[in-house]
């Protein structure tokens, strides 16, 4: 039986979240994390292998808080995202760097743990059950052979991904007539408005289509994508100034570049579910309330374990 792998990116540092590690915030009715619900939804959709991408210094705490209990219900592996995990010529060149390299390198960290198509998600995002069903179906459709690279993306409705507590950055997607991805525009400073959504600028708010599809870093890749990631990471590093200690190797930007070059086709399925996450510390009560509501509605049990 093919392993259906869920890769959870949990190594990032939430610069706007405040105190604590947002991936480990307890939001469930019995102290569960958002990841617990993601894993439960993924398993119900047929996923049977979880790879946590974490920071090595958090390993013991991570396993104690969530990893060990998840290992009781599904196969679990750990990948460690390390700043020093770069091709040999660049290790010394960027020795002063302290900022993680971004989502592209996070996926590369699990290159030896993934043996088939896989789904990538953020640890601190709740995507909803529908998204995992769509993603599981996409595992059969992605490929890196014959006519080139085909990957998948689950998009969400912009208006269902906003925060009441500040601005957010979203990858706003333009689709082709056949439903494939045409482009992603990383858009910062998106806020809720009375009309729906807009971009906060110095001149005021520029309205956005509240129903536009957006990327929330929920990607489906063939195993062969690891080779592409490795090759492109080398190119990214070779073009980077030695003094630049902040630029990141990011999945949406990489996919956008490959789309422009005609090197990839991205199949898109849009989930109608409400997304929620924790960009800000102030988002936590709303997440807890949303989960409480789903428990009361019978979508989840009072305790997942």
Predicted regions located by residue number:
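N-terminal glycine-rich phosphate-binding loop and ensuing alpha1 helix
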Residues: 2-67, 74-76, 81, 116
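A short, conserved beta-strand element in the Rossmann-like catalytic core
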Residues: 14, 126-128
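Short phosphate-binding loop-to-helix
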Residues: 70-117
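Short, surface-exposed amphipathic charged segments that create phosphate/polyanion-binding patches used
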Residues: 87-98, 166-171, 282-286
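Short beta-strand-to-loop acidic/aromatic patch adjacent to the donor-nucleotide binding site
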Residues: 116-126
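Conserved core of the sugar-phosphate nucleotidyltransferase
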Residues: 129-219, 223
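A C-terminal functional module that forms or caps the active site or interfaces directly
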Residues: 230-264
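Hydrophobic helical membrane-anchoring modules
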Residues: 265, 275-305
């Amino acid at each position: 039986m093919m392993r259906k792998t869920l890769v959870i990116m949990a190594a990032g540092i939430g610069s706007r979240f405040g105190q604590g590690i947002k991936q480990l915030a307890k939001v469930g009715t019995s102290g569960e994390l958002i990841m617990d619900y993601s894993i439960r939804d993924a398993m119900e959709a047929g996923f049977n292998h979880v790879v946590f991408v974490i920071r090595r210094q958090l390993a013991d705490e991570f396993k104690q808080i969530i990893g060990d209990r998840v290992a009781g219900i599904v196969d679990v592996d750990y990948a460690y995202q390390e700043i020093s995990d770069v091709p040999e010529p660049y290790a010394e060149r960027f020795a002063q760097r302290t900022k993680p390299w971004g989502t592209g390198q996070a996926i590369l960290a699990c290159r030896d743990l993934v043996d088939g198509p896989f789904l990538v998600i953020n640890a601190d995002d709740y995507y909803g059950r529908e998204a995992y069903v769509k993603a599981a179906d996409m595992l059969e459709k992605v490929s890196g052979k014959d006519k080139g690279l085909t990957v998948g993306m689950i998009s969400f409705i912009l208006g269902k991904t906003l925060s009441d507590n500040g601005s957010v950055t979203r990858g706003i997607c333009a689709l082709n007539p056949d439903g494939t991805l045409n482009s992603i525009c990383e858009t910062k400073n998106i806020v809720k408005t009375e009309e729906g959504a807009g971009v906060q600028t110095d001149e005021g708010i520029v309205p956005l289509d509240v129903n536009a599809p957006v990327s929330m870093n929920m990607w489906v890749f063939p195993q062969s994508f690891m080779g592409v990631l490795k090759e492109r990471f080398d190119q990214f590093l070779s073009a980077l100034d030695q003094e630049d200690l902040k630029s990141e190797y990011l999945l949406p930007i990489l996919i956008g570049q490959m789309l422009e070059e005609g090197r990839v086709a991205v199949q898109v399925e849009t989930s109608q579910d409400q997304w929620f996450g924790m960009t800000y510390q102030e988002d936590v009560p709303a997440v807890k309330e949303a989960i409480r509501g789903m428990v009361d509605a019978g979508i989840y049990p009072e305790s997942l374990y």
